[in-house]
């Protein structure tokens, strides 16, 4: 199992996603390792799902979740500086409240909920922001 799968399959991360199915490495994604004060704490990643549209996600171990906002904002700065992304999306299962709060905390706007999105069981709330909305959020906050 590679490091990405090790994080994605950590019991505390599985508990909040995909009905406990775990995570498989996807070669089409661009992954970034997260370290806080020298300690490995998780992964952030994106996948270009449409031209210039990135589906973005984070998998943090519990001990670094207190830094999640700073990590998320640094990730936005990185992709805005190093790519031409025009839209970002993300989603969080209804049962994973931390994921929903995280999306709002880093400047994404709630788009809506799709019922039974994960395996016909879990409802999932989707979030998005344009490049301009992210830049404005980074410059001014809410």
PLM segments and residue spans:
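Short amphipathic alpha-helix that is part of the acyltransferase structural core
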Residues: 1-21
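Short, high-confidence coil segments that cap the C-terminus of an alpha-helix
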Residues: 29, 84-85
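Short beta-strand micro-motifs in enzyme catalytic cores
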Residues: 30-32, 54, 121-127
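Conserved beta-strand in the GNAT
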Residues: 33, 38-48, 55
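Conserved acetyl-CoA binding element of GNAT-fold acetyltransferases
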Residues: 49-63, 91
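Conserved acetyl-CoA-binding loop-helix of GNAT-fold acetyltransferases
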Residues: 65-81, 101, 105
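Conserved beta-strand-loop-alpha-helix junction that forms the acyl-donor binding cleft
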Residues: 89-101, 117-118
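Conserved catalytic-core motifs of GNAT/GCN5-like acyltransferases
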Residues: 91, 109-125
């Amino acid at each position: 199992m590679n490091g990405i799968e090790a994080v994605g399959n950590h019991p505390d991360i599985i508990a909040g996603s995909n009905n406990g199915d775990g995570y498989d490495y996807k070669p089409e994604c661009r992954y970034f390792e997260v370290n806080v004060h020298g300690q490995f704490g998780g992964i952030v990643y994106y996948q270009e799902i449409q031209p210039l549209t990135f589906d973005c996600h984070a998998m943090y171990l519990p001990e670094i979740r207190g830094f999640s906002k700073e990590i998320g904002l640094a990730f936005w700065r990185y992709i805005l500086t190093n790519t031409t992304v025009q839209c970002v999306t993300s989603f969080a299962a209804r049962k994973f409240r931390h994921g929903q709060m995280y999306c709002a905390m880093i400047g994404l706007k709630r788009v809506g909920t799709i019922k039974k999105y994960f395996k016909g069981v879990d409802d999932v709330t989707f979030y998005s922001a344009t490049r301009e909305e992210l830049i404005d959020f980074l410059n001014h906050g809410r």
